């Protein structure tokens, strides 16, 4: 393991500003980065946070976008179609966020209903100050962390963006833990007890997919950054900001990042004309290894889901909906590292489908299986490719299938 730089610990400060200044100097020493410009910081109450988040939601996450996200997650059996996603996320972020840095405004806030920073606020400041250092040295906006779509990298998939978030949060979490390690044992215990005693009723009742997506950048991101740090110190972590991970697969398997195992590009044809009147596309993107695992975990044990998702090479999904008829279509095209990995996924997905429908396939042929219930699921595989189609009836799936030829 790499040795950690040990900056001198400042004398106990007497005001909130002095406290934060002292933490900033300590974090700069621990992280090996110095602030290069001015910034704004402030304490914000829970009530102010909710007002701020509500304004951000209204500006950047419309009811239409939330509805599309809900329908997409519903197509993967991860949310009910009528789940109030937008309102729930506002409640969740208000409850969960202890502080945040805004790369667009270069401001960061620590959430507290007190004027003097306690142990939670001090540790949160260390985490958020790391984000400021990241932004000043590596430009978080250029990496995609912005509400301005014009400034985001083009063609950056949701999976790649989640991988970048894991890098950013993993780095800040490692730095936060290094800061904690410099505190007296009594203060570390005080912090842990404060964290454990924080009520989280909204998080506790959140659908599993939301909990998993919220924690992935911190848990898996920390493991990824820790791996980089142990291999090459802060130089390796800094290099990852200049050459960010391309997929959640690279986060979950750091050796694939080191080998630059890039995702296989997969494309799908437009299907609106094929589907006919009343249908529109809700979403098209890359699912990625992480969300593929989350999807499988709805009906499979975690270890089986992890094994089935490992070996992911690339994918593309599309969700189309006919809201008037209450119908949806899921298309998921998966490319695997090799035929054996594809076969392992097929075996696991057959078990998933059997649990979803309560029975085995209605029809089978070499390289394909079809389940029939209140909707129809068609699974096809050939070499290292797997195609999954689920929709309201077989006739529609047949038309869609005719538009998606297997690679030769």
Please provide the spans of the model-predicted regions.
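C-terminal soluble interaction/assembly domains
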Residues: 313-408
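Pan-zinc metallopeptidase signature
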Residues: 200-333, 341
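Active-site recognition of the HExxH zinc-binding catalytic motif
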Residues: 27, 123-140, 169-173, 225, ...
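Auxiliary, metal-adjacent structural segments of Zn-dependent hydrolase domains
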Residues: 18-117
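Acidic helix-start/capping segments at beta-turn-to-alpha-helix junctions
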Residues: 36-56, 146-156, 191-201, 243-246
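Short helix/loop segments within enzyme catalytic domains
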Residues: 167, 174-202, 229-243
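Post-HExxH zinc-binding segment in Zn-dependent metallohydrolases
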Residues: 135-192
